[in-house]
Swiss-Prot record:
Cellular component annotations (GO), alphabetically ordered: gap junction; plasma membrane
Membrane topology: Multi-pass membrane protein
Native organism: Caenorhabditis elegans
Protein's recorded name: Innexin-10
Region Disordered: start-end pairs: 488-514, 527-559
Length: 559
């Protein structure tokens, strides 16, 4: 009954899928091994006779039981058979004392708790992040994934969950939001490196724990003769040294106790057999060499995860291998292929996303990890234009905006570069967005969220053909070309029929300078002021009542 109750408790220290094989050696295998050994030793200590003593003939059975219980509760000491016992002093007996055998079960249970603690810490910290790593790995390890429909549904669910969690990190990073302004350490759960950092800390705790356990074992056994108990025991075994000579885990020890007889104190020294030390010797030799092997495995695992977490090139190669094995037409030898993967990791997956894919690949296999990377890659390229615009869209000033800018905003040295760089970026963004407008629901929702209420929609092609050409047109390149502005005459001629993109506020900021007002009037004479309502024809076009002289003045002003 007791054994069944103890074994039923092992489900609370069961293994988890959100760790690698070395972690399970610590938190599952070693922990359960120590609990089992503690139960075995406890049965011998508390269920049998751990010590049996040789008492004088004058002792009755009750005195014999008393002597054995006293020697078990107090400490015995060891004296080799070739040394006299009568001449030993109290201090010398205290140095030879053996006091660890009573505490072996409790020491083993304490070690089991130490091996389990880093796993509980990892589970707690990982649960406070937006990425539920334990649930993700469980879903990827679902046995029903052999069914295609269930596998596709699980991959879709994982993709949606990762997208939501990673989008939250990108939003905080973009807006530079710090939930805790003073205690910056509490902002780590909101970063895109939190799960990876916590796993590396857990690995370090595993490594530190196994090193401390080796030191505690030497301290607990009081092996002053050996600096490292296991190596000393191995040397004694190879040299044929027995416990009688070494004194390690002695089977026979001595015990002193006093008996009050008729008011007089009688001192007795009896010889006892420590049967429990036969088990203790084998247990601690096994544990010492197991800890040594575990130390080697843990160091290698910690170094591996540290390397793949900090060295970006390994993450790029990891994603490239999965893309090459997927159904996507991806060739790593093409120009720009590695740059695409870099952008995929930097702008989309981040460190935690790559970590989750690695962990799922370890638990579920390469095929499932490849399918997940394929789905994430397709979603990234499907949302990359919207993602780029939402991440790089600047703030639009609440004032009247035109393209080209008013003459007061034009650099007199270089007419094609604005004095106000923020306005130039805003106008460039407006023009780039207008080229990607379609009638889909997703685009319309994006326009509603990103465009201000006073921005005008792009006109249709028929409306563009009815427009009068614009004489001056500047061509812009995107942000990936270092924000440079170019003026190409050939491109201007091709785009001459395309009107500028502009928008206006209902309450434009008045111009204080008299020259600015005059230039504004000249500009307005040539270009009709756009309407303020959305959805109407709001493009500034040339009017029929303008004179040639007014056109020439306005054009010379722009140049």
């Amino acid at each position: 009954m007791v054994l069944a109750a103890v074994l039923s408790m092992l489900r609370y220290v069961g293994g988890s899928d959100d760790r690698d094989f070395v972690d399970r050696l610590h938190s599952y295998f070693t922990c359960n091994l120590l609990i089992g050994l503690a139960v075995l030793v406890s049965f011998k200590q508390f269920g049998g006779k751990p010590v049996e003593c040789l008492v004088p003939d004058i002792f009755s059975s009750s005195w014999e039981q008393y002597a054995e219980n006293y020697c078990w509760a107090s400490d015995t000491y060891y004296v080799p058979t070739n040394e006299p016992v009568a001449g030993l002093q109290s201090d010398e007996k205290r140095q030879r004392k053996i006091s660890y055998y009573q505490w072996v079960p409790f020491f083993l249970l304490l070690e089991a708790a130490c091996f389990r603690l880093p796993s509980l810490l990892w589970k707690y910290l990982a649960g406070h992040s937006g990425i539920k790593i334990n649930e993700i790995v469980k879903l990827s390890s679902d046995p029903n994934n052999i069914k295609p429909d269930i596998k596709r549904a699980n991959i879709k669910s994982l993709t949606v969950h990762l997208q939501g969690a990673l989008r939250f990190h990108r939003r905080l990073q973009k807006k530079q939001i710090r939930p805790h302004r003073f205690l910056w350490l509490f902002n780590l759960p909101y970063s895109a490196f939190f799960v990876t950092a916590m796993y590396l800390c857990t690995k370090f705790f595993y490594l530190a724990n196994v090193c401390l356990q080796l030191m505690f074992m030497n301290r607990f056994l009081e092996t002053d003769k050996y600096k490292w108990y296991g190596m000393g025991a191995l040397v004694d075994l190879l040299n044929g040294t027995t416990w009688e000579q070494s004194g390690m885990f002695p089977r026979v020890s001595l015990c002193d106790f006093d008996v009050r007889v008729m008011g007089n104190m009688q001192e007795h020294t009896i010889q006892c057999v420590l049967v429990i030390n036969i088990f203790n010797e084998k247990i601690f030799i096994l544990l010492w060499f197991w800890y040594l092997a575990l130390l080697v495995f843990t160091f290698g695992s910690f170094f591996y995860w540290l390397l793949v977490s900090l060295w970006r090139h390994l993450n790029v190669r990891f994603i490239i291998r999965h893309l090459e094995m997927s159904d996507i037409a991806f060739d790593s030898s093409e120009d720009g292929a590695q740059e695409k993967v870099n952008r995929f990791i930097s702008n989309y997956l981040k460190s935690d996303g790559v970590f989750v894919i690695r962990m799922m690949t370890l638990q579920s296999g390469v095929i499932f990890g490849t399918d997940l990377v394929q789905e994430l890659w397709r979603n990234f390229h499907g949302s990359e234009p919207q993602l780029k615009r939402s991440n790089s869209a600047p703030k639009i000033e609440e004032r009247e905006q035109w393209w080209p800018a008013y003459p007061s905003l034009v650099n007199p040295i270089n007419p094609w570069r604005y004095r106000d760089e923020n306005q130039a970026n805003a106008l460039r963004w407006r023009r780039a967005l207008g080229a990607n407008v379609d009638n889909s629901i997703a685009t319309q929702d994006l326009m509603e969220k990103l465009l201000p209420q006073n921005a005008h929609m792009r006109p249709s092609d028929d409306e563009l053909l009815n427009r009068q050409p614009i004489a001056v047109q500047a061509s812009y390149i995107d942000d990936e070309s270092d924000g440079k502005l170019k003026n190409e005459e050939k491109q201007n001629q091709q785009n001459a029929t395309q009107p500028p993109y502009c928008y206006t506020n209902q309450n434009p900021t008045p111009y204080q300078n008299q020259n600015q007002i005059q230039n504004q009037n000249q500009y307005s004479n040539y270009y009709r002021t756009p309407s303020l309502s959305r959805g109407t024809d709001s493009r500034p076009v040339s009017t029929a009542t303008d004179t040639d002289q007014t056109k020439k003045q306005s054009m010379s002003t722009f140049k």
